[in-house]
Regions:
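Adenine nucleotide-associated cytosolic modules
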Residues: 1-268
Length: 268
């Protein structure tokens, strides 16, 4: 254990004592690089738990500022950071929790023009976005780049999580081939969301990330996990890989990233 400082041995002692983690596993976490899309309801708990676990490099991208309505569920922010960029607020929170962690704050919008450059040096991508254009863009980019993706979504009292391993299982388009028509599915702003729900789903996403880094346990490959907060139920839905999927199928028809946002706005 000489590769750890005394502080690290204490900080990560509950990890190191686990046979499935140990010193080698903790080193994997410290050397890992994770890219989180969104510093809101899902990105906050994902980043917080990954920072606590000692994931060495965490990048977050988000173009928004902290608003009072965020504080009902976005645990990395506070009244002291109102009006400040969400990524800077989250960076300060995570680095205050664990100075071992390098948090890279990117205050900009993810797009087809920058996503491949952003994710190329990261081991795992986490999607904590709150809109369909971003969700499809992230899925397609990760499939094309061969990057594992942990995707989460929340609305009202329900959340879902799935893990996508390009070349070894389904992708988001195997589940939902095309975006729903604009306006069909309301946003959290329009329909609301239970404040604790992002914590449950974000915690599950963080768990998937840690298992991927450690190479332990079973991840949600070819499965969609659905949580209902009102009923306190979890259920798994099988999601087989679609051989005719336009992105990850045998003969993909989508071979370059599209301007999903413009397409979605046009549908509105």
């Amino acid at each position: 254990m000489s590769e750890f400082t005394e502080d690290q041995l204490q900080r990560y002692s509950r990890h190191i004592i686990l046979p499935e983690v140990g010193g080698k596993g903790q080193k994997k976490l410290l050397n890992a690089k994770v890219f989180i899309i969104g510093a809101g309801g899902l990105g906050c708990p994902v980043g917080y738990y990954l920072a606590a676990a000692g994931v060495g490099t965490i990048a977050m991208i988000d173009n928004d500022e902290v608003e009072l309505s965020n504080l009902q569920r976005q645990i990395a922010h506070s009244v002291k950071t109102l009006g400040k960029p969400k990524v800077e607020s989250a960076k300060n929170t995570f680095e205050s929790l664990n100075p071992d962690v390098n948090v890279i704050a990117l205050k900009q919008r993810i797009s087809k023009n920058n996503i491949m450059e952003f994710i190329k040096d990261y081991d795992i991508v986490v999607d904590g976005s709150d809109n369909f254009p971003t969700r499809y863009l992230v899925n397609d980019a990760c499939v094309m780049a061969g990057k594992p993706l942990v995707s989460g979504a929340i609305l009202r009292f329900e959340g879902q999580v799935t893990t996508i391993i390009p070349g070894d299982g389904h992708c988001y388009r195997c589940l939902f081939e095309e975006m729903p028509p604009a306006g069909l599915v309301p946003s959290c702003q329009e329909a609301g969301v239970l404040g604790v729900l992002p914590g449950v789903i974000g915690g599950l996403q963080a768990t998937e990330v840690l298992k991927l880094i450690l190479g332990k346990g079973d991840v949600l490959k070819n499965e969609l996990l659905i949580y209902n907060a009102l009923k306190t139920t979890f259920r798994k839905v099988k999601v087989p890989k679609n051989p005719d999927c336009p992105v990850c199928g045998k003969n993909p028809t989508i071979t370059e990233l599209l301007d999903y946002d413009a397409e979605y706005c046009t549908m509105r």
